[in-house]
């Protein structure tokens, strides 16, 4: 057996610290210069790879020696990964590049219990690592014939825009009428209690603005983002694998606009009608360099994973720091996976699912995030993310009866004496001839469930219960009542299966004691200035007309606070698209309060 390869790279730190420099990550105030020297010892007869499976770096940070261990992330790409771009004349070109010998790594600092690292070794060393609770970035210095790199703290990168940034999701969580339950309180199956690993095949679409911004560096930028997202979700036992990349080089396939809710809806429609037919995947995210209205830098549909209509997210490339953009993507993926924003009851107020991006950004999930995700798995049972790795990944010779599903086997339940799986013929490791299905919401004892059996209950009055067809193991696509139908005793109107009302949006931001501000608070939206406006066009804040004030800034306050128009940085959201703004009227995508009978 070939011994595990160990590569040692020594970084000598010059006795020099720069005061200020412009790097790819931005303007850095304080940094150290290091020079990597690679020392490789290959086992006799071993095949030289472009990028080794394991590497070790030794260098100094603040004069103290550290050892950085790295391992190639072999789960970064799905086995059927493909890319689509477009020729100058608009022809679609899809390729299936080899991605096995890639250059993206995860790692840790030796003797640091909570350390992490996400590094690209494609052209020098670029990425981040955590040391003694602080986040450090490393990237090559672009000097001729030099191996010089810069190492610097995240806090030493000058932020061009210090205003708080936030997720655009302000609707209440997907089970707003029930308090969050701990995972231990849920009625779950034995399989779910074991926290089985989930597998998300992620499709990424980059719009023309992203291509114009990054050009030839766009693909490595995306790969490093997903590499960091993959690492973040390890703690949740969720594998994020890139299955597809589509670059809109010449023209955008939708009208990407600054209204994030409109862009999200347009992308969801394109994904359902075009992308799903082109490439099988579980969730799709759009990366754009457009500046969304207000402080919004991302948006996604909550509890939408595996939903053909809604399993999407959008992420604004608002900073040159790759890690921060990856954290925004991880946040929006969290919404897809049923995770709502962290509230006051959570043990962490600066974690990934905080509505406002923390500074420095966190790579941790709170206890609430874990509970929300487990609640989602139990309530929805999303089948698409329970797919185990391909059987071809197992390279040992198959042995029927060893309880391992191997190549050439349809099932393996152990010996005939011990087999407890009625669908499987233990002697042949094949399914019985009468078996119609093995799993699924509409599969019962290896046969399709009778037609008409409810397989997905209505989650709200705007949702529709689905029933089995008797011809498939899968529950039909999640559908909902028509947009504009009255809901919550006429306090709102249905929109994409939800009933968006201001009260629940306030609860999502502030907790159960929050209520909607007084009517006079919303008159501030006629000012047309930062935080008080209806929409933003070309960096200009457009004031609301009197009749549209409840489609601009959302005002909330606590019931025990006499300042009824109080607002702060954690409440900088715009009223949601589809929210009732007057009797018979809702907010449209242009932030006008319009007749509900004409908007949908």
UniProtKB/Swiss-Prot annotation:
Its cofactor is Zn(2+). It is an enzyme of class 3 (hydrolase). Keywords: Calcium, Cell adhesion impairing toxin, Disulfide bond, Glycoprotein, Hemostasis impairing toxin, Hydrolase, Metal-binding, Metalloprotease, Platelet aggregation inhibiting toxin, Protease, Pyrrolidone carboxylic acid, Secreted, Signal, Toxin, Zinc, Zymogen. Residues 198-389 form the Peptidase M12B domain. A motif (D/ECD-tripeptide) lies at residues 461-463. This metalloproteinase-disintegrin-like impairs hemostasis in the envenomed animal. This is Zinc metalloproteinase-disintegrin-like stejnihagin-A. It comes from Trimeresurus stejnegeri.
């Amino acid at each position: 057996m070939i011994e595990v390869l160990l590569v040692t790279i020594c970084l000598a730190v010059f006795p020099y610290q720069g005061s200020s420099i412009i790097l790819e990550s931005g303007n850095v105030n304080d940094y150290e210069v290091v020079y990597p020297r690679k020392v490789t010892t290959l086992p006799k007869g071993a095949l030289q790879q472009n990028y080794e499976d394991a590497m070790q770096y030794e260098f100094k940070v603040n004069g103290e020696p550290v050892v950085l261990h790295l391992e190639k992330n072999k789960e970064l790409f799905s086995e059927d990964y493909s890319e689509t771009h477009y020729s100058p004349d608009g022809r679609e070109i899809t390729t299936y590049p080899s991605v096995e010998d890639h250059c993206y790594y995860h790692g840790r600092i030796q003797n640091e219990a909570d350390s992490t690292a996400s590094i690209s070794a494609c052209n020098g060393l670029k990425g981040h690592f955590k040391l003694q609770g602080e986040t450090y970035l490393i990237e090559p210095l672009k000097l001729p014939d030099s191996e010089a790199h810069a190492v610097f703290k995240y806090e030493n990168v000058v932020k061009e825009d210090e205003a708080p940034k936030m997720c655009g999701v302000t609707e209440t969580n997907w089970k707003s009428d029930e308090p969050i339950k701990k995972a231990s309180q849920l009625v779950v199956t034995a399989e779910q209690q074991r926290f089985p690993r989930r597998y998300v095949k992620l499709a990424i679409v980059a719009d023309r603005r992203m291509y114009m911004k990054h050009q030839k560096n766009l693909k490595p930028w995306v790969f490093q983002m997903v590499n960091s997202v993959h690492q973040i979700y390890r703690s949740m036992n969720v594998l994020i694998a890139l299955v597809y990349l589509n670059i809109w080089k010449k023209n955008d396939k939708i009208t990407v606009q600054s209204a994030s809710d409109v862009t999200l809806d347009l992308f969801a429609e394109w994904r359902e009608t075009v992308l799903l037919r082109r490439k099988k995947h579980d969730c799709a995210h759009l990366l754009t360099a457009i500046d969304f209205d207000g402080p919004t830098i991302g948006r996604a549909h909550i509890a939408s994973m595996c939903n053909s209509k809604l399993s999407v997210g959008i992420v604004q490339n608002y900073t040159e720091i790759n890690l921060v953009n990856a954290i925004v993507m991880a946040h929006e993926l969290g919404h897809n996976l049923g995770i709502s924003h962290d509230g006051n009851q959570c043990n962490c107020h600066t974690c990934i699912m905080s509505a406002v991006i923390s500074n420095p950004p966190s790579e941790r999930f709170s206890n609430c995030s874990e509970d929300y995700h487990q609640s989602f798995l139990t309530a929805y049972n999303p089948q698409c993310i329970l797919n185990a790795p391909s059987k071809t990944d197992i390279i040992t010779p198959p042995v029927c009866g060893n309880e391992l599903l191997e190549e050439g086997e349809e099932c393996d339940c152990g010996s005939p004496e011990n087999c407890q799986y009625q669908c499987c013929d233990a002697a042949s490791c094949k399914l019985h001839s009468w078996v119609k299905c093995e799993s699924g919401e509409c599969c019962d004892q290896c046969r399709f469930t009778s037609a008409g059996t409810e397989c997905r209950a209505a989650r709200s009055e705007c949702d529709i219960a689905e029933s089995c067809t008797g011809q498939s193991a899968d529950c039909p696509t999640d559908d909902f009542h028509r947009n504009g139908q009255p809901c919550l005793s006429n306090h709102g109107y249905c929109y994409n299966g939800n009933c968006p009302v201001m009260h629940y949006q306030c609860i999502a931001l502030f907790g159960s004691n929050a209520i909607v501000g007084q009517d006079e608070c919303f008159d501030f939206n006629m000012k047309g200035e930062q935080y008080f406006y209806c929409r933003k066009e070309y960096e200009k804040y457009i004031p609301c007309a009197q009749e549209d004030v409840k489609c601009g800034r959302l005002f909330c306050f606590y019931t025990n606070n006499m300042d009824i128009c109080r607002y702060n940085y954690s409440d900088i959201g715009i009223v949601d698209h589809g929210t009732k703004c007057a009797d018979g009227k809702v907010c449209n995508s242009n932030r006008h309060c319009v007749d509900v009978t004409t908007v949908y």
